[in-house]
Amino acid sequence: MTDREKFMEVVELYGRKMYEVSAGLGMSAQTLYNKLGNVSDFTASEMSRFKDMFPEVSDETFQEIFFAKELAVKANE
């Protein structure tokens, strides 16, 4: 599961617009919002592109965004 809030924090911190992020990830804005809503998952190549777009993001934050275990546990409760 993806942590939408952390994803958005990174985007805002670096002053990016969602349309810029979606284009950089190679998808439409609607597809990005679907992935952030956990309708579908980010692929490995999309996650890699995110890391390329935001190289300053720590590995820990990257893991928290794309492998949000706490959200997965809450969703199953």
Give the label of every model feature segment.
Residues 1, 40-45:
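Short acidic alpha-helix initiation/capping motifs at coil-to-helix transition points
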Residues 9, 34, 52, 64:
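DNA-binding alpha-helical recognition surfaces that contact promoter or target DNA
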Residues 45-61:
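DNA major-groove recognition helix of helix-turn-helix/homeodomain DNA-binding modules
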Residues 1-20, 24:
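A short, Lys/Arg-rich alpha-helix, primarily the initiator
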Residues 15, 60-77:
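Short, charged recognition helix plus adjacent turn
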Residues 27-42:
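Recognition helix of helix-turn-helix/homeodomain-like DNA-binding domains
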